[in-house]
């Protein structure tokens, strides 16, 4: 994902609708966020500092993205599951891009849509996770970070 080129891009989607894009310049370590003309005409900013006119600074975008990440052990589990560094904010956001708070997703351009799949959780598996969270964290299911499942805190919803 971050293999030598300077600019990296994620699409912002609300359902199936493309509403904008996030760009990261790895040489300058800066972010840019822009909305599609259609979204600018009838949508709303993702956050008050992320204005529809695209004037948000890299620091404002970085702060917004950082707030999408879990804290403490949740972040540690995410970093471990994705095998990326704590400072690689772009890779972290891409890694949880389909599972961030809210309805907007962050995906690579032309990344295929993966339908949501549900699976039953047995009482035994749930008990194991509650009794041994250091081995079976609530934030990782089936080898993937699942942040919205646990509310990114060591609790069950």
Where do the model's predicted regions map?
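Phosphate/dinucleotide-binding and metal-coordinating scaffold of catalytic cores
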Residues: 1-157
């Amino acid at each position: 994902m971050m293999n030598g080129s300077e600019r990296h891009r994620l699409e912002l989607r609300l359902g199936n609708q493309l509403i904008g894009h996030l760009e990261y310049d790895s040489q300058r370590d800066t972010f840019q966020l822009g909305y599609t003309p259609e979204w600018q005409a009838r949508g709303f900013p993702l956050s008050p500092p992320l204005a529809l006119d695209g004037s948000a600074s890299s620091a404002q975008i970085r702060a917004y993205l950082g707030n999408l990440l879990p804290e403490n052990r949740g972040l540690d589990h995410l970093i471990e599951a994705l095998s990326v560094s704590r400072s690689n904010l772009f890779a972290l956001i891409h890694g949880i891009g389909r599972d961030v708070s809210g309805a907007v997703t962050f995906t690579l351009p032309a990344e295929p849509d993966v339908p949501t799949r549900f699976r039953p959780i047995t009482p035994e598996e749930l008990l194991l996770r509650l009794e041994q969270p250091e081995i079976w964290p609530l934030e990782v299911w089936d080898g993937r970070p699942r942040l919205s499942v646990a509310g990114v805190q060591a609790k069950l919803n």
